[in-house]
Swiss-Prot record:
Family per similarity comment: Belongs to the PsbH family.
An example molecular function term from Gene Ontology annotations: phosphate ion binding
Protein's recorded name: Photosystem II reaction center protein H
Function: One of the components of the core complex of photosystem II (PSII), required for its stability and/or assembly. PSII is a light-driven water:plastoquinone oxidoreductase that uses light energy to abstract electrons from H(2)O, generating O(2) and a proton gradient subsequently used for ATP formation. It consists of a core antenna complex that captures photons, and an electron transfer chain that converts photonic excitation into a charge separation.
Intracellular or extracellular location(s): Cellular thylakoid membrane
Record NCBIfam families: PRK02624.1
PANTHER family: PHOTOSYSTEM II REACTION CENTER PROTEIN H (PTHR34469:SF4)
Main location: membrane
Cysteines engaged in disulfide bonds, as pairs: none
UniProt topology in membrane: Single-pass membrane protein
Gene Ontology annotations for the cellular component aspect, listed alphabetically: photosystem II; plasma membrane-derived thylakoid membrane
Length: 66
């Protein structure tokens, strides 16, 4: 039989949701949307770095970052 400790008693509420899941897809579509937005963000940064995305009037100088 497991021994009860103070630490275990303090951490027990954190584990009270164990095994409970939202039926169906839950928040998976929201996660997918954020993943796509993050991909677009990374692609824009890559294009700025490669100078394949040119923004008029904005000078991009990567030498000052190093």
């Amino acid at each position: 039989m497991a021994q009860r400790t103070r630490l275990g008693d303090l951490l027990r509420p954190l584990n009270s949701e164990y095994g409970k899941v939202v039926p169906g897809w839950g928040t998976t579509p929201v996660m997918g949307i954020f993943m796509v937005l993050f991909l677009v963000f990374l692609l824009v940064i890559l294009q700025l770095y490669n100078k394949s995305l040119i923004l008029e009037g904005i000078n991009v100088n990567w030498n000052g970052l190093g």
